[in-house]
């Protein structure tokens, strides 16, 4: 009678193969979940920026000078733009408790305006867009309308 205190080579190979198959199916699911979460965070950040810029517009409207925050030179809300002095003396960072949000890859969003004249009414829109090619929310936009 043989005393067996360990695994045979075949048992070890089968176990490693099964673990490999399980990991192979779990990694894409994990990656997809991370990507969806990052996209949600980016869209939430863009929505927060839009809401703050809309509030800035309404705050200035109350004192008789309605306008959106100044546009960045190259549309990117980067470090240079974050320190730009706005019409009321604040910087964009000050509108966000000292930290204008970036996307999950730490890249700035794009900010620009659009205007439409429809039925004799002028509609102004601000657009916040993710332009980072590596971002899961690439080309997603959040639009605010006045």
Give residue spans per PLM region.
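Extracellular/periplasmic head regions of type IV pilus-like filament subunits
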Residues: 58-131
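Low-complexity, S/T/G/P-rich flexible repeat/linker segments used as non-globular hinges
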Residues: 125-146
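Membrane-proximal N-terminal amphipathic helix
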Residues: 35-62
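Residue-level detector of intrinsically disordered/flexible regions characterized by low predicted structural confidence
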Residues: 4, 108-109, 143
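Proline- and acidic/polar-enriched loop/turn elements at helix boundaries
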Residues: 32-34, 69
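N-terminal single-pass transmembrane signal-anchor helix
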Residues: 2-30
């Amino acid at each position: 009678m043989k005393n067996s205190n360990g695994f045979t080579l075949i048992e070890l190979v089968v176990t490693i193969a099964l673990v490999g198959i399980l990991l192979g199916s779990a990694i894409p699911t994990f990656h997809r979940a991370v990507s969806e979460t990052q996209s949600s965070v980016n869209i939430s950040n863009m929505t927060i920026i839009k809401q703050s810029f809309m509030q800035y517009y309404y705050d200035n409207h109350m004192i008789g000078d309605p306008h959106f925050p100044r546009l960045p030179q190259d549309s990117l809300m980067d470090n240079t733009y974050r320190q730009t002095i706005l019409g009321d003396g604040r910087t964009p960072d000050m509108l966000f408790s000292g930290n204008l949000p970036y996307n999950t890859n730490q890249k700035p969003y794009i900010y620009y305006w659009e205007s439409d004249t429809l039925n004799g009414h002028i509609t102004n829109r601000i657009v916040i867009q993710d332009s980072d090619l590596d971002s899961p929310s690439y080309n997603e936009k959040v639009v605010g309308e006045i």
